[in-house]
Design a protein with these regions (language model features):
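Short low-polarity hydrophobic stretches
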Residues: 1-3, 56-57
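Active-site loop segments of alpha/beta catalytic cores
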Residues: 29-168
Length: 169
């Protein structure tokens, strides 16, 4: 994907996404970075042991909403979320499976916490309807949190903007 940056020092926006077909039939263009699953757990644990007096957070960070924007472009993703094509669900499942495997591997290390992020809010409100967030994204976040807790880890979630409409969830 190609990012367009209109202001120096500020992250850009995808203007030429990888997935351009409305049915997501070209989603095979997207590379799921399986190689990130090959890190050395023992090496991470040795590093953690050297910093036993510190609170250590894993070196991975699932961000499904932002990743989908990078892959599809913001406007196209918003349309997909309103009327999701079958290919969208298939890709989302594949991406979520990858993130779960990555978190499980990090959960095997001696870090104190796992983390995830997605920037959900504008200055005034959530970027999508809270009901769509609850249906599509909340179950993934729940899985990520469950992985952390099942391994005795804390989970941190970063988000920017006004997210008050989903905080009670």
């Amino acid at each position: 994907c190609v990012f367009t940056n209109i202001q120096r020092g500020v992250i850009g926006e995808v203007k030429h996404p990888l997935v351009t077909e409305d049915d997501w039939s070209d989603a095979d263009k997207v590379h799921i970075p399986e190689e990130y699953l090959s890190f050395d757990v023992d090496q991470v644990n040795r590093s953690c042991a050297q910093r036993a007096d510190k609170f250590l957070i894993a070196g991975c960070c699932p961000r499904p909403f932002e990743q989908l924007q990078f892959i599809r472009g913001t406007v196209n993703l918003y349309m997909d979320l309103m009327d999701p094509p079958k290919g969208f669900w298939a890709f989302l499942e594949k991406m979520h499976d990858y993130y779960c495997r990555l978190l499980k591997k990090w959960a095997q290390t001696d870090v104190d916490a796992l983390n995830m992020m997605d920037d959900w809010g504008s200055q005034n409100s959530l970027l999508i309807n809270p009901k769509i967030w609850e249906k599509v994204f909340m179950p993934m976040y729940r899985d990520y949190i469950d992985i952390a807790h099942a391994h005795g880890k804390k989970m941190f979630m970063h988000s920017d903007g006004n997210t008050l409409s989903i905080i009670p969830r």
